[in-house]
Regions:
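Conserved, mostly hydrophobic/aromatic
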Residues: 44, 72, 122, 195, ...
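Catalytic domains of carbohydrate-active enzymes, especially glycoside hydrolases
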Residues: 59-75, 197
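Active-site pocket-lining/capping segments in soluble small-molecule metabolic enzymes
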Residues: 19-31, 149-175, 225-291, 321-332
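Active-site beta-loop-alpha junctions enriched in small/polar residues
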Residues: 45-48, 75-79, 104-110, 135-137, ...
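Active-site mouth loops of central-metabolism enzymes
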Residues: 40-56, 101-113, 169-187, 266-286
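Active-site-adjacent beta->alpha loops and helix N-cap segments on the catalytic face
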Residues: 24-25, 53-54, 80-92, 111-118, ...
Length: 332
């Protein structure tokens, strides 16, 4: 396979809608029911910040290998050693495990030249599946977004750039409740359709807790563009394991936890959240299981879990949903 375009100028014109990437399965190709009848699932990892965090990530990766996820994704750590560690660990996941690996790529604070270089690094590691995002300002997701003077303004532009660089499968983000920077849901849906028309093959949602928001998103995309509306929208969820993780969940979802769910967690916590932490965790697992089951019932193409580099809570939810674990990691 030629990598000639990866670090050079992009190929003009619209990329083909169904890229042929020799030797690298696409995410869409993985979205078929498993032999046991369950729908595909996938997991998200975060770049490890130090050696201890990296060891924890690898333990989680080996645990998930035993459940045969359709793919794993690695979020993007921008800048300095975090960026370098992200690229290295993402490449190792692709080379040293059986896990189909998706690398996140964000436009924020990068020039086009830097973005091309990052894509080239992933290509050199054999990674041909990218999740393309505009990204939030580091340190303040709600802060003012500023385009790099030599960078890109919109995720749609980044999709076109990546597709013009060579053989890549591209996914994008979608937002069941709308992105906080979008003026309204109709405009937000139009942005998603533009990213799909630019060459994205699927989207992964921002985390949410109300399945109806996901269903309404699907309907909006079909109404916006019936052709692009046929592309998979993979829902993202995260088990809440303590009251402390509620704040993290709200940051990731961009919305407050629904009152009915918060009440269930607070009831389990009682007057002593620390003493009742196991009860709170059990309710969090129960809530994630309920959300996952409804998504399955509503025909979701897969389930994508935020793991924070821990396997236990997600594997418990998956077990509740009927997924099985093999005796040993498949690449051990």
């Amino acid at each position: 396979m030629s990598f000639d375009n990866v670090r050079g100028r992009s190929t003009p014109g619209r990329p083909s809608r169904t890229p042929q990437v020799s030797g690298t399965p696409s995410i869409v190709e993985q979205l078929v029911r498993r032999p046991d009848g369950t729908i595909p699932f996938s997991v998200e990892f975060n770049p490890p910040r130090d050696a201890a965090a990296e060891a924890r990530l690898w333990r989680a990766a080996r645990e998930f290998e035993r459940m045969h996820p359709a793919f794993v994704s690695m979020t993007y750590g921008a800048g300095g050693s975090t960026r370098d560690r992200t690229a290295r660990v993402t490449g190792q996941l692709a080379r040293e495990t059986t896990l189909l690996t998706v690398a996140h790529l964000t436009a924020v604070e990068h020039s086009v030249a830097e973005l091309r270089s990052i894509v080239g690094t992933y290509a050199d590691a054999g990674i041909r599946n990218l999740l393309v995002l505009r990204g939030d300002p580091p340190g303040d997701p709600l802060g003012e977004w500023r385009k790099h003077p030599e960078g890109l303004e919109y995720a749609e532009e980044l999709v076109r750039m990546v597709r013009g660089l060579g053989d890549f499968h591209v996914g994008v983000a979608s937002f069941p409740q709308g992105h906080h920077r979008s003026p309204d849901l109709d405009r937000d849906t139009a942005y998603l359709c533009a990213k799909l028309r630019a060459g994205a093959e699927y989207s992964i949602t921002q985390m949410f807790f109300d399945v109806d928001d996901y269903l309404r998103l699907r309907d909006r995309v079909v109404a916006c563009d019936p052709v692009e509306g046929a592309k998979p929208i993979i829902p993202e969820l995260m088990p809440i394991t303590s009251l402390r993780t509620v704040q993290r969940a709200e940051e990731l979802s961009g919305r407050p936890l629904p009152a009915r769910l918060l009440q269930r967690l607070e009831k389990a916590a009682g007057n002593d959240p620390e003493a009742n932490r196991n009860a709170v965790r059990a309710v969090g697992i129960e809530i994630a299981t309920e959300i996952g089951q409804r998504l399955i019932d509503e025909g979701a193409p897969g389930l994508h879990f935020i793991t924070l580099n821990f396997a236990k809570a997600t594997t418990e939810v998956l077990t509740n949903l009927g997924y099985t674990v093999t005796a040993t990691p498949v690449s051990a």
